[in-house]
Swiss-Prot record:
Family: Belongs to the bacterial ribosomal protein bL35 family.
Gene Ontology MF: a single term: structural constituent of ribosome
Organism annotation: Prochlorococcus marinus subsp. pastoris (strain CCMP1986 / NIES-2087 / MED4)
Name used for this protein in its record: Large ribosomal subunit protein bL35
Keywords tagged on the record: Ribonucleoprotein, Ribosomal protein
SUPFAM superfamilies: L35p-like
The organism's taxonomic lineage, starting at the top: Bacteria, Bacillati, Cyanobacteriota, Cyanophyceae, Synechococcales
Biological-process GO terms, alphabetical: translation
Amino acid sequence: MSKLKTRKSAAKRFKATATGKFTRRRAFHNHLLDHKSSKLKRHLKTKAVVDERDADNVKLMIPYA
């Protein structure tokens, strides 16, 4: 059987954890940050875990993660 291809766009956006879950960046932290509070911006810097309903699709896109 041939090797499975990795979707590079997904590989750049998601990272697998040691327990098999995936982490992702949060949205809304690129620009237009002036009106957002420091607390919100600090929260948006942190990584989030991909929801279990979406994890199966991410796993298919990154088969060797």
